[in-house]
Design a protein with these regions (language model features):
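Short acidic-glycine-tyrosine-enriched beta hairpin
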Residues: 77-93
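A short, N-terminal "cap"/entry segment at the start of jelly-roll beta-barrel domains
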Residues: 1-38, 118-130
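A short hydrophobic beta-strand segment most commonly corresponding to one strand
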Residues: 89, 103-119
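Glycine- and acidic-residue-biased ligand/ion/polar-headgroup-sensing regions
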Residues: 59-61, 65-71
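Short beta-strand His + acidic residue motifs that chelate non-heme Fe in jelly-roll/DSBH
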Residues: 54, 73-74, 90, 96-102
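Conserved short histidine dyad/triad with adjacent acidic residue
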Residues: 26-29, 42-57
Length: 130
């Protein structure tokens, strides 16, 4: 028998509100619902004009894919404009933060998964003159 899990990401729990970020985005982290053991995935729907805090990882590499909308990614000290179907690979130690354009920004994020691997950078934008 095939071993797989199928679900719709929009039907998973929106975790943003329980972390005080409901005004900024929807955030779906269906790793457990999918039964993932070594990988992670998330759907992040950033509201128009909103910025997400930055973060890095200790060991996890990530790939972000723009599903819809537009915006700007803060990647280390660089800024990269984003549009649908852009993909960005990030080494663990590279700072990443996102800002939605006027039409919002929807991202799928994929990566390896290790507990307690994230290092938050809440002042990423202001520390880089933005």
């Amino acid at each position: 028998m095939a071993d797989y899990t199928h679900l719709n990401l929009l039907e998973t729990e929106d975790d943003a509100a329980k972390h005080g970020m409901g005004d900024t985005l929807e955030a779906h982290f269906p790793r457990e619902a999918l039964g993932c053991e070594r990988t992670g995935v998330s759907l992040q729907r950033i509201k128009p004009g909103q910025r997400l805090f930055g973060h890095t990882h200790k060991t996890d590499e990530e790939i972000y894919v723009v599903v819809a909308g537009s915006g700007t990614a803060l990647l280390g000290d660089d800024r990269q404009e984003l549009r649908p179907m852009d993909a960005v690979r990030l080494a663990p130690e590279t700072l990443r933060a996102f800002e939605a354009g006027p039409d919002g920004l929807e991202l799928l994020a994929f990566g390896t998964h290790h507990d307690d691997d994230s290092v938050m950078a809440p002042d990423a934008w202001s520390q880089r003159g933005a």
